[in-house]
Amino acid sequence: MGADESFGIPWVRLCPLWLIILGVHNILMTVRRMKTYAGSQGYVYQYYFVGKRPALASDPEAPATEFVFDVTSDRKLTYAVSVFLPEKAAEAWKATHGRALSDAEQYAAVKLRLFRAFDEIEQVRAHGRRLTVDAAWLEEALASLGVE
């Protein structure tokens, strides 16, 4: 086999195929944006949104939607923080406002709950890995954003 061939095919011919494979691979991979938040306790947190899923049926917060964030305050150890939005809180908001929450509104309330934990809990890793958005907090958070 020559220096410019691989498996009997000139390497130049494989290059476009590899570029296509890498391009498709990158499209299929989720790109997560690392964001920063300076908490009032003096810690600077970096976090990104991992995803959301229905809470497990055995979870004390169920039925709820679990929003998962990966968080670090030292850039060495990353840990998951789950923020639960119980169905009863979303239903209470719907009853008050006459419409269901959009996905963006749910995410906004959950993210504000995460920020509140960053501000109020000194060691989020030890004491703030499971957070809940109750009906009162949901109303307060969305009102602060002007959502009605």
What is each residue range found by the language model?
Residues 1-17, 23:
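Short, low-complexity, charge-dense intrinsically disordered segments
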Residues 18-19, 127:
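Generic alpha-helical structural signal
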Residues 25-148:
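Extended, alpha-helix-rich binding/interface surfaces that flank or overlap catalytic cores
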